[in-house]
Amino acid sequence: MTDASKRTVRLRAEHDGDNSRYLDASLDMGGSLVIKGQDLGPATAIVSSDGEYEWTSTFAPVDIPALVALLGGAEGADILDVLESYTDRRSYELERLIRDSDVPHSLFTWSG
């Protein structure tokens, strides 16, 4: 395992009453970028019967340069370094940019 595959960027860790929201990014062993989110609490009721909603967006290594460019990073920049500027409240902007872009990625969602 490389050092890069061990690194995780905490994009969001929010707590508001009974609700919590988390978002993390890391590189997997194959070099894909994996962004994982988890929402817990009554605010998830619209999508989850048990108070938990999870999702994972995965970007293949070949698509990471396009994501770096979308996020304003320099050519060749480390995606995890670029993502360091999208933490806390800015993590919502990150999600919007990804959602509105044509950068290829897979999306997996789970709710109880």
For each of these PLM feature ranges, what is it?
Residues 1-34:
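Short, charged/polar N-terminal "headpieces" of proteins
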Residues 17, 41, 63-65:
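Residues that cap or initiate secondary-structure elements
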Residues 24, 29-61:
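A short, structured beta-strand/loop element
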Residues 47-112:
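Mixed-charge, Lys/Arg-enriched low-complexity segments
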